[in-house]
UniProtKB/Swiss-Prot annotation:
The gene is srb-11. It comes from the Eukaryota. PANTHER family: SERPENTINE RECEPTOR CLASS BETA-1-RELATED-RELATED (PTHR31216), SERPENTINE RECEPTOR CLASS BETA-11 (PTHR31216:SF0). It is found in: Membrane. This is Serpentine receptor class beta-11.
């Protein structure tokens, strides 16, 4: 595609702006780093967790969307860096319309997809809390339905938002949304943000219900304690994860909207303003890195508390001896390898 000389000069000024260059390198590094804790948590923690199948399905889909977003940003930022290194002509810095449209779709799709899942988690957790004593036996139907609905709804919204865009403006960043679609995207971001704020209100109520559930643990039978303890711990994890996600997304939306509409009030140079606006998009990959690390850490604490609760549930008599015996051999197995011994927990 042929571009005007002015478009190529503009592309050169934007591509080699120091702020834009810094955002590219930071985005590449943080996206790369975020993939490892996310995949680690998915494969070695979440997939092996004792969460109910409905909640696990939603969480797996949520973390897969985060991994996909980080991989997308890693690919686009690396491509932008390579183009700035190997380009011999100013016009070579401009991204072709077709790849720009494809990667821009993926960026928006995975960005917004992850913001739908907190609402799904809240719906699932309310159902779990209302049926806590028998939820363990509930069929795994709600989770897949909520995930399928989220994916389909988000796909239709993003597809209709971008389907008529030609992407012929000549941009140097895959994250840049065409002017007409940008207004729709920002409106969509704000709507999602306020929906998530409403979700926070329900999550606070859910947290209060969860505290009441914790009190029930003291006066429940051993069999019921196991079920209630799992609902309590998984709900606690869910609420904190949702709150962190919404805070991060709120910061992202605020930064993007502020620098788009008010950035010129504090940054007069348009090239530097463009660089700052692209830098604000690195908030989400940074969140992905933090949430992957946080989830693994929180899960470790949850496991330790669950082990402690298991021992405390029965600490006297024959069952108490079995619990103590199992705990000792669990520690021994973790140090010296597996031992062929059957320990029954009563």
């Amino acid at each position: 595609m042929n571009y005007s000389s002015q478009a190529c000069i503009t592309a050169f000024n934007l591509a080699y702006n120091l702020v834009f260059q810094a955002s590219n390198y930071y985005q590449m590094i943080i996206s790369f780093c975020s993939v490892f804790p996310l995949i680690y948590f998915l494969l070695f923690k979440l997939s092996k967790s004792s969460f109910h199948g409905n909640l696990k399905t939603i969480f797996i889909s949520y973390f897969v969307s985060l991994v996909a977003f980080s991989m997308t940003h890693l690919t686009t930022s690396t491509t932008q860096i390579i183009k700035s290194i190997i380009s011999t002509d100013n016009c070579d810095l401009i991204i072709s319309p077709f790849p720009h449209k494809i990667w821009n779709f993926f960026i928006l799709f995975f960005l917004t997809l992850s913001t739908f899942f907190p609402c799904s988690v809240t719906i699932e957790r309310y159902f779990a809390m209302e049926t806590a004593e028998k939820y363990e036996k509930a069929s795994v139907v709600m989770g897949p339905i909520l995930v399928g609905f989220n994916v389909l709804l988000n796909f239709c919204i993003i597809f209709n938002m971008l389907k008529d865009e030609s992407y012929t403006d000549g941009n140097v960043s895959f994250s840049v949304i065409p002017a007409v679609a940008a207004q729709k995207a920002f409106t969509f971001f704000i709507i999602i943000f306020f929906v998530n704020l409403v979700d926070v209100i329900f999550d606070l109520i859910l947290l209060r219900m969860n505290l009441k559930l914790k009190l029930q643990l003291k006066n429940s039978s051993l069999a019921v304690k196991y079920q209630l303890e799992e609902v309590y711990q998984s709900t606690k994890f869910s609420v904190f994860l949702i709150l962190i996600h919404i805070i991060s997304f709120g910061i992202y939306v605020s930064a993007v909207v502020f620098f788009r509409y008010f950035g010129n009030l504090i940054i007069s140079d348009p090239d530097s303003l463009f660089g700052v606006r692209t830098f604000s998009t690195t908030i989400v990959p940074t969140y992905n890195f933090v949430i992957g690390s946080f989830s693994s850490f929180f899960n470790r604490i949850k496991l330790k508390k669950s082990e402690g609760a298991t021992i405390q549930m029965s600490s006297t008599g024959k069952s108490g001896a079995n619990n103590y015996d199992q705990a000792i051999f669990s520690i021994w197995n973790s140090v010296s390898g597996p031992i062929d011994r059957n320990v029954t927990l009563v």
